[in-house]
Amino acid sequence: MATVPQQIPGVATNSFLSKERTIAAPGFNRWLVPPAALAIHLCIGMAYGFSVFWLPLSKALTGVAACTPEMGWFEELFASCNWRVASLNFTFTLFIVVLGISAALWGGWLERAGPRKAGVVAALCWCGGLALGALGISMHQLWLIWLGPGIIGGVGLGLGYISPVSTLIKWFPDRRGMATGMAIMGFGGGAMIGAPLAVLLMKHFSSADDPGVAQTFLALAAIYFVFMICGALGYRVPPSGWRPAGWTAPAGNASNTMVTQRHVHLNVAWKTPQFWLVW
């Protein structure tokens, strides 16, 4: 008769993606974390390079007129005319808006779930959004481009943006500015690498009646997924109470203390009118 394995009392069974499985072992080299963070930020940073797609997509249908300026945006979502550049560029607006909203909504979840799980979810959303965008281009449905790269991809941007920053700051409390700068450098450099790569891919896939953007989306999704998953699996978090050798936290002083002593939690802050005025 088969026996059912019993869980040892006091020992939790954690999944491979759980935060507990990412706690670094003693002697772990913290300088192995920045490459993992850069791998994710270089991929999602391509959001700033999407402008290379707008002109080819505005001429995607051969022998078809462009959508007229009088056409409403809702009608254009399902129209069979060539899309306007302004309508395509709205995808970037969705990127940035959803990035901020998702970072605010799921920032607390990231701290509980850990950067590895957040990195995997970011890869699925960002690359899945690109794949859905490729489908939208093939079907000539603008709403799928807004939904795929814009909204779903925007969620991947938000999670992919904050997880490297949060992790690096934990590993480099003595060099917070440098840690944040390394992560942001990757986000800004993503377009510098991704945009020329996208242009080369479009030239490779293009034909007389196809600008090759859909195939480029799929190729980028595959490339980015590999790098983002490798980056997410490379994440480690320091054990509780860890600090760099020879470093002691600076004593509190006027330059480091908060202006207010009320320490408003995010769950309370977002319910205040001041939060929305700043946002």
Question: Predicted regions span which residues?
Answer:
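A structural feature recognizing the 12-helix transmembrane core of secondary solute carriers
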Residues: 1-279
